[in-house]
Amino acid sequence: NMFEAMGIWEKIKEASTPINKIHVSEKGQFGFSHICSKEQQVEALGYVVINRVLGEVMLSELENKENIKMFCPYEIDSFSERQTDCNISLKPNDKKKSKIELTSQLLIAASGADSGLHKLLGINSNVINYHQDAIIGNVMTAIPIENRAFERFYSEGSIAFLPLANNRSAFIWVLPNHKSEIMMNTSNNEFLEMLQKEFGLRLGKMSDLGNRVKYSLSLTRALRLHTKRSVLVGNAANGLHPIAAQGFNLGLRDVATLSDCIYEEIINEEFEKNIGKILNKYSAWRNPDHEKLTYFTDGLVRLFDSKSH
């Protein structure tokens, strides 16, 4: 566990909800798939962590590190590579503050799929637009979800339910662009009625709808993972459809692999000399995992999309 190695897992675990059972079904079909943590002989199949809590824990850890300096809120305005280092210009969000010029041996971009940093680095991406959106929110359910996760496929998309604290459930509702626009503009009661209709009564009657947000869905894959002095990790390297819920885990593996590659050269006191070697090794180790998971995720999306036509 990477968070255990960082010494922050216990804080994250306190605010997380374990998933012990996963139930996958398709509307209108009799069969379903069921996975249990006991059968798999693991403590949990996964954990649901509130993004805000995860961010707070990690931010607190960063603030306590004397060798880490944060510039926030700033964004990268320009980037240039030289033979021995790179130059990064930071632009403040606050107009009263001045630009900051940084010189570094390496830039690690963990900026997400849509940050625009790819263009500054000169890295192109392949993008597949699924013409779908994900609406994310939370509800109360009459039947407690009790550490179970559900994924329900139907003719136009899918609905996933994940356990939260206090008998609340998070949902991720994937649906076509034109339908998502309609659903975002409905009243809470109308939204709950449609959500209930597509998911069914497995968790009983739904109520007390929280805030909902919408994200467009696509597959984004960088055509290369690094330049001479910059490297991509997480969604900056691959932005996946949430159908398999593997995007965050893929990003964690990127960070763990890059850390190992860097650490190996640091202990040999050859980091500055071997940056090219580090980045080539990182790409060689990560590309097979990226390729396998992007093809798998894209295949699932296309499989269920073909069933809807």
Task: Show the residue positions of the predicted features.
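A general structural signal for well-ordered alpha-helical segments in protein cores
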Residues: 51-55, 132, 136, 191-192, ...
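Pyridoxal 5′-phosphate
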Residues: 83-84, 145, 251
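Short glycine/proline- and charge-enriched loop/turn segments
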Residues: 35-42, 175, 297-300
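C-terminal helical "tail/cap" subdomain of flavin- and related membrane-associated enzymes
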Residues: 260-309
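FAD/FMN-dependent oxidoreductases across multiple families
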Residues: 182-275
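Glycine-rich FAD cofactor-binding loop and adjacent beta-loop-alpha segment at the N-terminus
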Residues: 1-19
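Conserved N-terminal helical subregion
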Residues: 15-120, 128-133
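Conserved FAD-binding catalytic core of PHBH/FMO-like flavoproteins
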Residues: 3, 93, 99-101, 106-205, ...
